[in-house]
Amino acid sequence: MLCFIQGMFLITSSSCGYALRTSKDAPRFSQWGVRRVYIRPIQNETFRAGVENSVYTQTVRMLSSTPGLRSVNSPEDADAELVGTVSLAQRTVSGETKASDLNPKNLGSPLLLVASEYTASLACSFALTQKGKILWSGEFRRSRPFPANSQVGALGSTGALINESEFERALGEVAADMMVDVRSSLTQDF
């Protein structure tokens, strides 16, 4: 029993540099005098309607989980404002296959290439401002592959609608992944 107690004492007293964070662990924000942040509506500079909503939702989630910070509903109640812009939201073909390989009856042309995979890309920039002064800013870009619906000659095929739906879902996931980078940069968690 004494060995067990000594072992536990050694384990707890020898620190490896990791510790649980508390809500008071926000030295960077304390230095700036920031505890409450207003998130401005995200600006959309792309031709992709609605992408700013996914980014805004993920930004609110990220800020809500950041120790020492609290999101507020009006700029008057805030110590600082987080401003964001979406500069790129697109999908590109990242995998192709011959149309004749997709149809068992070989109705498709062997010369016609059909997308079998896309890559969703998202680029955003953010800035934390206080009374017109920029406290922090950063630009972020993330991508993620997603499968394409490549049915050829199928009656009632809704390939375009399915691809569009998958793209929307992938953009939401990319935005969530991007917020990990934003939070790390904002809080300097390395």
For each feature predicted by the language model, list its residue ranges.
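Surface-exposed short loop/turn segments
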Residues: P67-R70, P75-E166
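Conserved acidic
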Residues: F47, V51, S116, E166, ...
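Sec-dependent bacterial lipoprotein signal peptides
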Residues: M1-S14
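A structural "domain/chain start" motif
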Residues: S14-G68, N73-E76, A154, R183-F190
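Compositionally biased, intrinsically disordered linkers/stalks adjacent to structured regions
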Residues: S157-F190
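Extracytoplasmic/secreted envelope proteins and their assembly/folding machinery
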Residues: E52, Y56, V60, V86, ...
